[in-house]
Amino acid sequence: MPPDASATREKLLDAAARAFAEEGVFNASLIEITRRAGQRNRSALNYHFGSREGVLCAVLERHVEFLARREGELLEIATRAPDDDVASVVEAIVRPAAELAQSGWRGRSCLVIIAELAGEDPATYSPELQAVMSRTGGYAVYSLLATRMADVGHDVGNERFALITTFVLRSVADRARLLDRRGRRGRPQLDHETFVRNLVAMASAAMSAPRP
């Protein structure tokens, strides 16, 4: 890819990441994304990515390798824990997200985007988006979590997975934003490790609660 084309692609990805995180994956205007990227040609985004889901997949691809590696490492530890240990599995969701949030606004945007997608029916994903989401390693984590969480039935279990994913990812992203604004009347924040452990404890308690 020529240098100019590569630079344009990166600008489009940055603009899309911000827009998807701020306005929603399905609400963000593709024309506005193109404008934010400084492109006069309205078809630039379609030229580089083909569609909304094409650019969405490309935005997520930036972080897939990191998430897959860290979740895989922590999942390996969790598999050696007792069969009723929920916290070690939940940590494989929380800790990689917290580490990604520390990498900068691109990582935080990715977390907000994934949190939104967690509320959607995976059956509606395109094959390309399904493939990207599966490569994050999250599906393997949730498969193990399903064997250790409280027996609440398929319907409540799926609801908890979606709610906890959204809760964890948005909590992590929001904390990172507050730290960026430190000194602007934001409330005091826990140190990183205490925050991670507290979030793991909260999410584990929710996943272990009996069926209502």
Where are these regions (language model features)?
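Amphipathic alpha-helical packing segments from all-alpha helical-bundle domains
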Residues: 106-112, 120-149
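Short alpha-helix boundary/capping elements
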Residues: 41, 53, 105, 118-125, ...
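Basic, helix-initiating cap at the start of DNA-binding domains
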Residues: 1-23, 32, 54
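C-terminal peripheral helix-coil segments that are non-catalytic and often amphipathic
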Residues: 135-212
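Helix-turn-helix
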Residues: 19, 26-54, 58
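Hydrophobic alpha-helical connector segments
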Residues: 72-110, 161
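Short alpha-helical scaffolding segments that buttress acidic/His motifs in well-ordered protein cores
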Residues: 93, 97, 111-118, 164-168, ...
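An amphipathic alpha-helix adjacent to DNA-recognition modules
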Residues: 9-14, 49-72, 76
